[in-house]
Amino acid sequence: MKKKNGRDSKELADFALGESQTNYPETYAPEVLEAFDNKNPGKIAWTTFVCTEFTSLCPKTRQPDFAKIFINYIADKKMVESKSLKLYLFSFRNHGDFHEDCVQTICDDLVKLMKPKYIEVIGEFTPRGGIAIYPYANYAAKDKFFQELYKKRMSEYAPGKYSMELSKLY
């Protein structure tokens, strides 16, 4: 018998996606992240998420900082569920941390959740005081191929290299 959907209802039962009431966390909340099984763990395929409205707080002034966050990853056995990722990123809005720390925290939390083959997180923060900050964090599994990818991407990184113009999204 052929399934109507690619996933059966048991696989989807525990996800927040589709709930009638969405609870938005008011503080940093890595516990809202959810993962699902990758149906193709033997493949090498990129997944990219673009968050165009990321907000956090400067830890010193408590002024808001705005950014675009780009997450590029190659999944292994688990993938991140997109609504949970949205809620997680939204949880930074009252979180006071420096740009570089926010990006590294996002990378570390996603590595802990999914254990991907490779992941990189790029933050393109709106300039304040005439200074633009574009932090980059990446991680690779121990496999030689992904370690080489890690080294290559890190050595070739430059602002805008692994992100995209928003005009391509809209």
UniProtKB/Swiss-Prot annotation:
Binding site for substrate: V80, E81, S82, H99, E100
Gene3D superfamilies in the record: 3.30.1130.10
Keywords assigned by UniProt, alphabetized: Cytoplasm, NADP, Oxidoreductase, Queuosine biosynthesis
EC top class named in words: oxidoreductase
Pathway the protein acts in: tRNA modification; tRNA-queuosine biosynthesis
EC number: 1.7.1.13
GO molecular function, one term: preQ1 synthase activity
Active site: C58 (thioimide intermediate), D65 (proton donor)
Subcellular location: Cytoplasm
Major place of residence: cytoplasm
Cell membrane keyword on record: no
GO cellular component: cytoplasm
UniProt protein name: NADPH-dependent 7-cyano-7-deazaguanine reductase
Gene: queF
